Amino acid sequence: MQLAEHATDHVLTPAEVRVLRMIAEGNANKEIAAQLSVSEDTVKGQVGNILSKLGANDRTHAARIGLKRGIIEI
């Protein structure tokens, strides 16, 4: 089980890891988009990918998974 759990850690792209870190810091999609100079739709797509790849129910759950697995630090 642990191997399968950690196998997903490397599935996130560098851009998705950056967005996940910003989510964990409390940023909304609009704020993330402005800081990264991308569209809000791009961020929404990345958030959707993050949730799917991590098996998270929502943004907060994704941040908790990311922190627990060591994908991100804040």
Predicted regions and their residues:
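Regulatory hinge/linker segments at domain boundaries
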Residues: 1-22
